[in-house]
A protein has these predicted regions:
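Short acidic N-proximal helix/loop "leader" segments that mark the beginning
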Residues: 1-5
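Acetyl-CoA-dependent GNAT
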Residues: 13-17, 23-90, 96-99, 105-110, ...
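Short hydrophobic/aromatic beta-strand or adjacent loop that forms the aromatic wall/cage
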Residues: 52, 153-157
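Conserved active-site alpha-helix within GNAT-family acetyltransferase domains
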Residues: 96, 122-139
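Conserved catalytic-core motifs of GNAT/GCN5-like acyltransferases
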Residues: 116-118, 136-153
Length: 175
């Protein structure tokens, strides 16, 4: 399993036994708005779909702390979507290293050229983490997301390209 620079976190492919943790994390207060949530059947369908990858972040000792769902692994143009990423207990400093580990996996294992995502326009914390991770804001999807209360909110489209990721990796390795 790849480890981050601090050696205390690792990343691997999720197994079916990780789905309860993923669903519990999606159901934490406020996460339905920021992260979204799926039913068990939706997760099982995506998990068994070869165009998806479920990744799980663990601390030393094996305790899960976060997950990521990647989709479009079969995109012929190398455009892979970071569909969902979440940390079960935010504020512990795991977000940025976890995102870096996920990007390393996507660019190495999935051989993506571009990783894209959309984020709620008012989710400043996530946007900050994505920008620190090398993502660039590409545009605004106006009122594109319906919230649980049926109101609508803008999404910000963001991406990072393989050359940007490589440059960032080189910069990190020389620091």
């Amino acid at each position: 399993m790849p480890q981050n620079d601090h050696g205390r976190l690792s990343l691997g492919r999720a197994t079916p036994s990780d789905l309860p943790f993923i669903m519990e994390t999606e159901r934490l207060p406020g996460f339905d708005k920021m992260v979204g949530r799926w039913t068990a059947d939706q997760h099982k369908a995506a998990y068994s779909n070869p165009s998806y990858a479920y990744l799980i972040g663990t601390e030393i000792g094996g305790e899960a702390f976060g997950f990521a769902i990647i989709r479009d692994l079969d995109d012929p143009h190398g455009n892979v979507c970071l569909k969902r990423i979440a940390i079960a207990s935010p504020g512990r400093g795991y977000g940025t290293p976890f995102l870096g580990m996920v990007l390393d996996w996507v660019f190495r294992e999935a051989t993506a050229y571009r990783v894209w995502l959309d984020v709620l326009a008012d989710n400043d914390r996530a946007r900050h983490v994505y920008m620190r991770g090398g993502f660039i804001e590409e545009g605004l999807l106006r009122r594109a997301y319906k919230l649980p209360d049926e109101s609508r909110i803008d999404l910000i489209l963001m991406s990072i390209l393989r050359p940007e990721w490589l440059k960032q990796r080189l910069t990190r390795s020389t620091e």
